[in-house]
Amino acid sequence: MERILKPVFLAILIVLSFSSQCMGFGESCQAGKHIVPVGQQQIDSSTCTLYKCSNYNRKYALETTSCATLKMKSGCRMVPGAATAPFPNCCPMMMCKG
């Protein structure tokens, strides 16, 4: 029985070790006060910014997405997004007549 358990236990450890490396287990990206685990995303509602931490061949990248800069046109006005809304609904919009 012990002969069977040792290889099985070793195989389980190898699989768990490999899966944690592939998933970036325990790894994270930092954006100011935000710590984003690999494979997850967080929203900074104070700046309406989306942070996503990705694993590209064991190289971690912090992807940052924020609201576009709007160039005002005549006959249009800026409407702020809802401060508590998730990204991108928190971004301001341009409302134009006609």
Swiss-Prot record:
Cystines in this chain: none
Keywords (A to Z) from UniProt: Amidation, Disulfide bond, Secreted, Signal
UniProt xrefs under Pfam families: SVWC (PF15430)
Main location: secreted
Modified positions (Lysine amide) in chain numbering: K97
Cross-referenced InterPro entries: SVWC_dom
Family membership noted in the UniProt record: Belongs to the scorpion La1-like peptide family.
Designated name of the protein: La1-like protein 13
Location(s), subcellular: Secreted
Record's signal peptide: 1-24
A GO cellular component entry from the record: extracellular region
PTM description: Contains 4 disulfide bonds.
Lineage of producing organism: Eukaryota, Metazoa, Ecdysozoa, Arthropoda, Chelicerata
Tissue and organ expression note: Expressed by the venom gland.
